[in-house]
Regions:
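N-terminal pre-domains immediately preceding structured catalytic cores
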Residues: 50-57, 171-179, 321
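A translation/RNA-centric and nucleic-acid-associated enzymatic feature enriched
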Residues: 108-110, 181-336
Length: 336
């Protein structure tokens, strides 16, 4: 079955009930570590936003948001969020955060156009975080420093879970390896972007691929990024090698966010300069929003990774094709 991988000899080491307990342990410990390492305060977050606000994440520009009308407001349309990438920057200003301070939130999203498999679901849950920085801190040094702080939280959580559950073991290396998307293309010119990620992650075990969204020397992009939150020169993905599925597993997408000049440039490159008229983008271009670094960290992804699960549906409750549910059950993989 194309969208279901069954690892040879896989048997879940925990029952469904034991898994639910372990999920909470992972989430509680990682959340505390992340907040401590980055000096973050937890805040409440929206499940839906108004389209005209410009606050929703347009992802690659083709994914359709789930929308509905509010009866009390003459069926005024709102959209379920794809992520909170832009909302967080707006919130930092509204809530009065200063340089060196940040926020994080539990985000739930629906991505109706997602192609599901062992790693992908139409339901997305992640810690969305954002931190205020100065204009002078918009550089590669700040990016790498912040990546290492996030990676330290990942390492701390794996160490904690490995002590709680003997079967887990520690597989993350002490340090994360940095490489740009162009360097990766130069290293494996014959490979697709996903193949490059797999080969390099398998070699280094934990990597951060920088500069995602920009066009490479080949004329292709490593991956898509919306033009109005990450600066494509100062962003990237944390990816680890996951031996259970013999695959590269993205745990986090993050970056230093666009300033006024980067937003103008990237809107033009993406051919969507009309977005400059939306509320969020107008505020940014007008210099009304703080400079920030931020990202999203998949909650189900890291639970799957730490608990050594074969399918993301073992750690989150979602909807899957009937044939996937039946095939998974027949092979001892219980989807929640």
């Amino acid at each position: 079955m194309e969208n279901l991988m069954i690892p040879e000899g896989y048997r879940p080491p925990l029952s469904i009930r034991e898994t639910e307990v372990a999920i909470k342990e992972v989430k509680d410990h990682f959340e505390r570590s992340l907040a401590k390492n980055l000096h973050l305060t937890r805040v409440s977050a929206p499940l839906f936003v108004r389209p005209e606000s410009g606050l929703n994440d347009n992802l690659n520009g083709v994914e359709r948001p789930v929308s509905f009308g509010i009866k009390e407001q003459n069926d005024k349309e709102v959209e379920i969020v794809h992520s909170l990438a832009k909302w967080k920057r707006y919130a930092l200003k509204r809530y009065g955060f200063h340089s060196g301070e940040g926020l994080y939130t539990d985000m739930s999203a629906i991505r109706r156009d997602e192609d599901t498999d062992n790693l992908h679901s139409i339901y997305v849950d992640q810690w969305d975080w954002e931190k205020v920085i100065s204009r002078e801190e918009r550089n590669d040094e700040t990016l790498e420093y912040t990546v290492r702080k996030v990676y330290a939280a990942l390492k701390e959580t794996e160490h904690f879970m490995a002590r709680r559950y003997n079967y887990i073991g520690e597989i993350l290396p002490d340090d994360i390896t940095f490489i740009t998307s162009q360097e990766l293309e130069d290293l494996y010119p014959e490979c697709t972007p996903k193949e490059r990620e797999y080969r390099y992650a398998k070699q280094k075990k934990a990597i951060f691929i920088k500069q995602i969204g920009k066009t490479l020397a080949s004329g292709e992009r490593h991956d898509g990024r919306a033009p109005d939150y990450d600066d494509w020169e100062l962003n990237g993905d944390i990816i680890v090698y996951y031996p259970v599925l013999d695959t590269a597993l993205e745990l986090s997408s993050m970056g230093i966010r666009v300033d006024e000049a980067a937003l103008k440039r990237q809107l033009a490159l993406a051919g969507c300069e009309e977005r400059a008229e939306l509320d969020f983008q107008k505020s940014l271009l007008g210099g009304e929003l703080p400079y920030t670094v931020g990202g999203g960290i998949g909650q189900s992804r890291i639970c799957m990774f730490y608990l050594r699960k074969a399918h993301i549906g073992e750690v989150q409750s979602s909807i899957w094709p009937n044939e996937v549910v039946e095939e998974a059950a027949a092979n001892g993989i219980p989807l929640l």
